[in-house]
């Protein structure tokens, strides 16, 4: 795997994690 592919996968996981985190915070409020 190239560095670009690894970077892209990491960015996707970061975005998904951020969305889930935002949804949980919205539910808390």
Swiss-Prot record:
This protein's name: Potassium-transporting ATPase KdpF subunit
Induction trigger: Transcriptionally regulated by the KdpD/KdpE two-component regulatory system.
GO cellular component: plasma membrane; potassium ion-transporting ATPase complex; potassium:proton antiporter complex
Gene transcribed to yield this protein: kdpF
Residue spans crossing the bilayer: 3-24
Subunit structure: The system is composed of three essential subunits: KdpA, KdpB and KdpC. The complex also contains KdpF, a small non-essential subunit. The KdpFABC complex exists as a dimer above concentrations of 30-50 nM, whereas the complex exists as a functional monomer at lower concentrations.
Bridged cysteine pairs (disulfide): none
Listed GO MF terms: P-type potassium transmembrane transporter activity
Job of this protein: Part of the high-affinity ATP-driven potassium transport (or Kdp) system, which catalyzes the hydrolysis of ATP coupled with the electrogenic transport of potassium into the cytoplasm. This subunit may be involved in stabilization of the complex.
Entry's Gene Ontology BP terms: monoatomic cation transmembrane transport; potassium ion transmembrane transport; potassium ion transport
Tagged with keyword Cell inner membrane: yes
Membrane side Periplasmic: residue ranges: 1-2
Effect of deleting the gene: Inactivation of kdpF still leads to a functional KdpABC complex in vivo. Deletion impairs ATPase activity of the complex in vitro.
Entry membrane topology: Single-pass membrane protein
Keywords on record: Cell inner membrane, Cell membrane, Ion transport, Membrane, Potassium, Potassium transport, Transmembrane, Transmembrane helix, Transport
Ranges of the Cytoplasmic topological domain: 25-29
Family to which this protein belongs: Belongs to the KdpF family.
Annotated compartments: Cell inner membrane
């Amino acid at each position: 795997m190239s560095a670009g592919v690894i970077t892209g996968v990491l960015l996707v996981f970061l975005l998904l994690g951020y969305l889930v985190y935002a949804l949980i915070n919205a539910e808390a409020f």
